């Protein structure tokens, strides 16, 4: 998903065709899905767990739904078929066990697609920002304070600070 988003941000218009599946449930998946909708595709996000287990921010999910993104929960990719281009995404239907772990049911469905975008386990290239401290999930960490009138910053981004040497 990161490469797809980078290409679009650089002004390219990737040919994803009329129907795309985005695999994953995080914010990168929501960004890729919304971007694909804006490129004219009918988009389905495929996630192996339920809506409650999605790591994406609730706001991101709501905005994706408002833009027309469809969601297929409890489905794990099992294969892609097509001649020279994706035509179908085969998914195995899942169930959550007592510990909320997805378990395959042995039942399958196919989703018609012209492109499949993977948004699983995305990592960004920090290129030159290796000293910025991050916490779980790669989020920037820093002091618990709000920006003042002279140091405005994005509330989502938070404050960044240099990592202390080990």
Describe these PLM feature segments:
Residues 3-17, 38-137, 141:
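A Rossmann-like FAD-binding core segment of flavoenzymes
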Residues 20-22, 143-166:
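Short FAD-binding loop at a beta-strand-to-alpha-helix junction that anchors the flavin cofactor
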Residues 24-26:
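Glycine-rich Rossmann-fold phosphate-binding loop(s) that bind the pyrophosphate
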Residues 29-30:
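N-terminal Rossmann-fold NAD(P) dinucleotide-binding loop
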